[in-house]
Amino acid sequence: DKLCGVVKAMRMRILELGGEVRFGTRMTSVLHSNGHVTAVRYIDAQGEQELPAESVILAIGHSARDTFEALHSAGVPMEPKPFSMGVRIEHPQRQINENQYGPFADAPGLGAADYKLNVQLPSGGSAYTFCMCPGGYVVAAASEPGGVVTNGMSDHARDGENANAALLVTLNPADFPDSSPLGGMYW
């Protein structure tokens, strides 16, 4: 419930520093010459545009497969990287409070309890919890048609009935069926 204000403040700071923020805009390619960026090509409501640029920061986020494919096709150096994949687990917040606080589970001022689990596997990988959301919610977060993605969130008060966390395993490039730089993405 505070994220909107944080994002707005970040955007305002970028603008104060002379940056630009473009909504309703999709980058289609980064143009370069002699190994240096020269421009960014994009599409907006007016059609395809080109913006001269000497430097570009791509804050791509998740599920930007088209962007990674375009950069790979343009010859941008890439290598496969490890990442984690898993599921969202959800349980009653009361249960977590009792497990963590014991007889003090109802003590005023303690708030919703959290937890973290981690195990190193003999294979060298790991299984762990991440983004534990006390008193939170499991939310749909797919950004592509046909995609199934979940995430978790807690309101500032952390007073929801349930808790949730991501339960993840580490995947290394050797685990991918395709050894290309985009092998993990296609898997």
Task: Write out the residue ranges for each language-model feature.
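Residues forming the flavin
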Residues: 1-187
